[in-house]
């Protein structure tokens, strides 16, 4: 159960029990999918949600790992930070990766830890030449500790530290080359950033190292009003003065699916994950959305 391909679903607790029940009802076993198997090609799991945790969630993950291919996607490695990588975290992460038999591990090209403090956010790094090799060295150290190939994800951001020496896409290419790692391309993140910062997302894709893409993410986003007090109420898409937030709280919009189709023409078939973290609907609705994604890249 280790081939990761097609269209997968980011596993979330909101529908975990339903997924287990429906998978069991379909008669799926460790060796064969049942006649009524769910149209889920694989699952993506964030190990931090299961590490050092007892009870039904890790047990459910172990059960699902015998029935679906699983790939892991991290949240807290802080590859763009300067704090030392957490050795205990890497040991726990490696054990989880082995347990679910993930063929690679991805995490975000960002910093989320500073001076030992977890920032609970995925903050952008400076797109400077001096940052390339230190980040690449951290990616290679993580790869060696985990025992599987690494891939880095482009993040959404709403501010940027310092003056950039290159575009984000060029920076991703430099880091991937220096680290000899894969790219976990988040199509929605690139689209959201293009709206907020006014750049051409197709040019961004032309500069990105698409030859290194091993996996993609798609998700929904939402528009919010912005004023002197900060981010306010939701507004209609395209509203003047609005900001687009990568909430993972809505269906994947048509422009993101259209962009996905253009990108897949260049990359060829790669595993695609649907992410949903806010306003999570019933599993049936997520399966319908996955069908839209399949139709888009068919």
How should each PLM-predicted stretch be described?
Residues 43, 105, 186, 216, ...:
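Conserved, mostly hydrophobic/aromatic
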Residues 16-17, 46-57, 78-88, 158-165, ...:
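Acidic-and-aromatic substrate-binding clefts and catalytic sites of carbohydrate-active enzymes
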Residues 283-298:
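C-terminal helical cap(s) of enzyme catalytic domains, especially alpha/beta-barrels
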């Amino acid at each position: 159960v280790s081939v990761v391909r097609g269209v997968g679903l980011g596993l979330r607790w909101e529908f975990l029990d339903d997924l287990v029940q429906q998978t069991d009802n379909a008669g799926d076993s460790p060796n064969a999918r049942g006649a009524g198997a769910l149209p889920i090609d694989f699952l993506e799991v964030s190990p931090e949600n299961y590490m050092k945790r007892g009870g039904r969630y890790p047990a459910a993950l172990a059960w699902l790992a015998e029935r679906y291919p699983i790939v892991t996607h991290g949240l807290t490695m802080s590859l763009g930070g300067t704090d030392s990588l957490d050795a205990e975290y890497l040991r726990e992460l490696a054990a989880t990766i082995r347990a679910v038999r993930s063929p690679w591990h991805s995490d975000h090209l960002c910093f989320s830890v500073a001076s030992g403090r977890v920032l609970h956010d995925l903050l952008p790094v400076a797109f400077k030449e001096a940052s390339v090799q230190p980040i690449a060295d951290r990616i290679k150290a993580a790869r060696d500790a985990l025992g599987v190939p690494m891939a880095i994800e482009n993040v959404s951001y709403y501010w940027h530290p310092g003056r950039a020496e290159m575009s984000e896409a060029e920076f991703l290419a430099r880091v991937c080359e220096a680290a000899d790692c894969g790219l976990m391309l988040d199509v929605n993140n690139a689209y959201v950033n293009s709206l907020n910062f006014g750049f051409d997302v197709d040019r961004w894709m032309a500069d990105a190292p698409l030859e290194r893409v091993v996996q993609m993410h798609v998700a929904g986003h939402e528009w919010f009003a912005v004023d002197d007090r900060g981010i306010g109420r939701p507004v209609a898409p395209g509203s003047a003065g609005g900001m687009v937030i990568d909430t993972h709280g809505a269906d994947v919009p048509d422009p993101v699916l259209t962009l996905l189709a253009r990108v897949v023409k260049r990359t060829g078939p790669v595993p695609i994950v649907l992410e949903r973290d806010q306003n999570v609907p019933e599993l049936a609705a997520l399966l319908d959305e996955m069908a839209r994604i399949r139709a888009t890249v068919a």
